[in-house]
Structure formats: C-alpha cells, structure tokens
C-alpha cells in the first residue's frame, strides 16, 4: 500500500450455504469499513471452485489465480466461517493453505456463526493465520443465526452490530500502521524483525 491510496479490506466468506448468516454479518462489516473510507471487496468461496490444496501440483486454475489476486490486493482481511463441530469450515482451511504468502504482514479479523460462541473456531483461524505470518485483532465477532437475525435474514441484535462496527473501525485504524511498518521492514536489511523471518523463508523458496 502507499500513502495516497485507500486502505483495502477483503472479506472472505467461508460458508457454502445460501443466505449464510456469517456472510450477512461480513457484508455489514464491509459496509462499515467503507463508511470509514476503506475500499472493500468480498471473496465468496461459494463462487470459487478451489480443488483441495496439493503443494506438488504445478498448474493453477483461474480460481487459484483469483484468490491470489484478491489477497495481493488486500491490506487487511476478515475471515467469516460457520462453526462446523468446533472448527472452521473446510473451505476456509483449504483457502488458507493456498495463500500463506499473501497473508504476511496483514491484519485479520474473524467472524463466526455459531450457537456456541465460536471461540474454538476463531482461535483456530487465528492460529492458522499466525503460522502464515499474519496478525490478528485480539477479539472476534460471534453471531447466532437462531437469535441474532429475523426471519428475513436481517441482523436484529444491536450488540452484534456494534461489535461489527468496532471491528471495522479497528481494522481501518490499526491495519495501515501494521501494513506500512511490515512492508518497510521487509524491504530493509534489518535482520531482527518478524518481517525478516518471512523474508528469509520467501527467498529460500525462490
């Protein structure tokens, strides 16, 4: 990112269900981020037919190219997943397997649709992102589709709405600080930084 361009927030929807409550919450968050001047984009994994990740496969489909381009575009990312037996959806995990390099030095937020608060789901997403050199907000947003939305799918829980607004604000405020410093560290010769560890690994794989 540069000082003269808007901050860019990518929302990644990891539910393959139509009218998913997690993606509804994600859209609301992206709207709040846009109100704060961010450029936003939604990557709906329902529309991306990603094969299971195979590190030894050399060919890259148009869908793989799309998710890589979207992640390259993003300065910050919000992952939204349903709670599947206490874990993130397979779609989200498969997505992260593809994009570890593109996660580096970016701030992440997490949304989970769950009737049990989704704490283990968000912690698993946070752990995976940390291993991909990403940074995470210290909280997430949990929604319960049974009580937080009306019959038409509209969010009715004001506390959840306020939490989504808070996350949008924090992404737009803290995200640029982190992104600019990480890019500066990555381009420098300084060796005692988190970015230097990532830089060393990237160059080892070139």
Regions found by a protein language model. Name each.
Residues 36-41, 134-136:
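A generic structural motif
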Residues 2-37:
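N-terminal beta1-alpha1 ligand-phosphate binding loop
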Residues 45-62, 151-152:
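N-terminal beta-loop-helix "entrance" segment that forms/cooperates
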Residues 3-5, 137-206:
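Glycine-rich phosphate/pyrophosphate-binding loop and the adjoining helix
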Residues 57, 62-135:
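Helix-loop-strand module that forms the ligand-binding subsite of alpha/beta enzymes
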